[in-house]
UniProtKB/Swiss-Prot annotation:
This is Histidinol-phosphate aminotransferase. It comes from Streptomyces coelicolor (strain ATCC BAA-471 / A3(2) / M145). HAMAP family: HisC_aminotrans_2. The lineage of its organism: Bacteria, Bacillati, Actinomycetota, Actinomycetes, Kitasatosporales. The modification N6-(pyridoxal phosphate)lysine is found at residue 230. It holds the Pfam family Aminotran_1_2. Keywords: Amino-acid biosynthesis, Aminotransferase, Histidine biosynthesis, Pyridoxal phosphate, Transferase. InterPro entries: Aminotrans_II_pyridoxalP_BS, Aminotransferase_I/II_large, HisP_aminotrans, PyrdxlP-dep_Trfase, PyrdxlP-dep_Trfase_major, PyrdxlP-dep_Trfase_small. NCBIfam families: hisC, PRK03317.1. It catalyses: L-histidinol phosphate + 2-oxoglutarate = 3-(imidazol-4-yl)-2-oxopropyl phosphate + L-glutamate. GO terms for molecular function: histidinol-phosphate transaminase activity; pyridoxal phosphate binding. Pathway: Amino-acid biosynthesis; L-histidine biosynthesis; L-histidine from 5-phospho-alpha-D-ribose 1-diphosphate: step 7/9. Homodimer. Belongs to the class-II pyridoxal-phosphate-dependent aminotransferase family. Histidinol-phosphate aminotransferase subfamily. Coiled coil: none annotated.
Amino acid sequence: MTFGIDDLPVRDELRGKSPYGAPQLDVPVRLNTNENPYPLPEALVERIAERVREAARDLNRYPDRDAVELRTQLARYLTDTSGHPLDVSNVWAANGSNEVIQQLLQTFGGPGRTAIGFEPSYSMHGLIARGTGTGWISGPRHEDFTIDVPAATRAIDEHRPDVVFITTPNNPTGTAVPAETVLALYEAAQAAKPSMVVVDEAYIEFSHGASLLPLLDGRPNLVVSRTMSKAFGAAGLRLGYLAAHPAVVDAVQLVRLPYHLSAVTQATALAALEHTDTLLKYVEQLKTERDRLVAELRAIGYAVTESDANFVQFGRFADSHATWRKILDRGVLVRDNGVPGWLRVTAGTPEENDAFLDAVREVKKEQHT
């Protein structure tokens, strides 16, 4: 008899579950994980090598435990791009925004506590909640994937969650959440508990609108999380961060592992922040390609959700997984997120997007013959 997971004394709530993960397939065009398709510029690669070489001289020592220089530069980046003044006391960094979320749930969630998100949304919120023993509540959305504010506030009032997740732009739909919606949910959360409200802005640099960082003023229970994986084109770096009241930054340090950010990670992230202007030019190119995908998909005859991210949700399909397979058979990998009738495609290079559009045109024609 084969020994497997079910034979181990794992927690009951983990039994029968599957780990998070998008398919990793060797195909000509991969547009399924919302990566930035542009390699880092050579000048940045050289600067990373210089900074890592400097850091390597001290690898016999532990890194800066609190990543003060990195947090200072992240605060400067947020201030410069949002107009909202922040300093090192407002920023915390970790190994990807998923670790940021994990630390928040370890601090404010956990056994006997709950978190709510409005689905479909970023699935890792619920998965990390489960991993930290936090009860998960799925909140409502309208059919157009916008948040149903009256229903959402009723859900918050009924369940009185300890943590509220709001993703804007939302993943996988791409829809942005207006500031007034965030404020309404924040007020509902404070009246019910009070609760921590986490605004996940992983894709905000691609948005038509502005960051919600200015909402931090006077709202100590509000947190904005970010990542360097998307706009900075550094998915392989694994660097996420949050902005919040200094008390929140102090609180998450109660659960962070010692020396959690390696010296190499800190050095690489600092090098990337030195090249912000160059990297954000790629963001503008991707926004143009994103808008082209929206227009072309609609012209082909697909329904498309309004997108403020670097990806587009399109449909409607009688069998979305079968359509995903037909696109894959043409050498293009997109994402089936499990949203019935819909698929998601990442904005790639113009050449990658052309290949994708050719594939879906063929699929559309095949489905109508």
